Structure formats: structure tokens, C-alpha cells
């Protein structure tokens, strides 16, 4: 069900970088992400499962077939892509991440998963920034993607509008942009929400109301049909944007 207070449209703003680092260029941003995940990537999936809620619900919204192309921006360890690859008809799967370190783990995990399911879906991984997404240049695709995912990624991007713009530009008309990210937690106990926000800030993760507002405006502008679903009493939201 859609959240009645937020089932409107969307429209992002200017952009520069897609990492939580405010460095001067892409190289600085990639280095910052590598520094953050160099050690934690080894236990990332184990620790994140307890507070990155709604990821599997997001994946349930991804429609795949032998001919579909699905991209996850900020794919991290490829956890979500590996789950999609386990489907009987996963289609073509792609992952983009700013961190070389995370992609090293993603490549290893996806290779291990392929051994367990011979003939299953294969995952193409590339290093790059979200706002610089280019299907042809990065992945050699002459066609746009059918589905693009952001899973708890936009809340780590200070210049997230560029990431949304790039995703929309690389999505086919009628294609779907899916986002799961932290919400305002206003239906949760105040003490819990406050403690959660303090803890997440240690990892440079913040709820960004402006992201939600921009997604609402994107729908109002006519660029896409936008709906929101609450996860765990507004702990997080799942946004579905169908490109017009």
C-alpha cells in the first residue's frame, strides 16, 4: 500500500559526487569509499542484515525475464544481485559501485555463487560513480536498462540528485527505478529513532528528507509515476518510479 502522505511525484537537483566524501574529484571519492570499506566489507553482509530492512521486499518488485536488463547502483558486495541471479529467469544483471574494495568482494561472492548454480545468471560489475552512469560507456550497452535499483545508497550520497538524474536518463521509457532507504522513523518510539540516527551517523549515513521531497517532485513534474510504501513504521521507505 502507498503512503498517503507521500504518494506524489519527484524531481532532483544539481549534482557533483556520489560518495559520502566531499573530495575534489572522482579519484578522491573512490579512495574515500575504499578507505571506509577496506576492512568492513568482509563482515558487511553479516552486520547490515539487521538494520537494512526492506531489501528483499525491494527485490520482489524487480521483474526479470530472459531479455531484461537490471542494474544496481551502489551494489556493494552484490548481495542483492546474487539473489536476483538465483531466479530461474534472471535476465542480464549489472552492478556499479564507487569502491574498488567492495567490488573485489562482490566479484568473489558472485563467482562463488555461480559455482553453486551453474548456468544461472551472471553479474557484470563496474567501478564508477552514480552520477556518471552511462550504460554504453560503462557496460557496452546500446539499450537502456529495464530496472535500476538503489538499496540504502542515496542516503550516503551528498550530491544524490545527479545520481537520480543519471538513473532516469539510463532507464527505458516504462522502466522502473526502485529505491529503498531510511525514512523519518516518526512512527517509532522517539528514543529509538534518536539512538538510531546517532548510530547511523557514525557510518556517514543520514535520513535525507530532501531526497524524499525530490522523488515526490519527480512525479509532479511528469517524469515518472511515483509511489511510496512504508517499511517497519517509517523506519524506511520503498519508492517505485515508473518512467514516463
Language model region names:
Residues 239-244:
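C-terminal lobe and adjacent flexible extensions of AdoMet/dcAdoMet transferase-like proteins
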Residues 161-173:
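A short glycine-rich, Lys/Arg-flanked "PGG" loop and its adjoining helix->strand segment in the class I
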Residues 131-148:
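A short acidic, Gly/Pro-enriched loop at the edge of an enzyme's catalytic core
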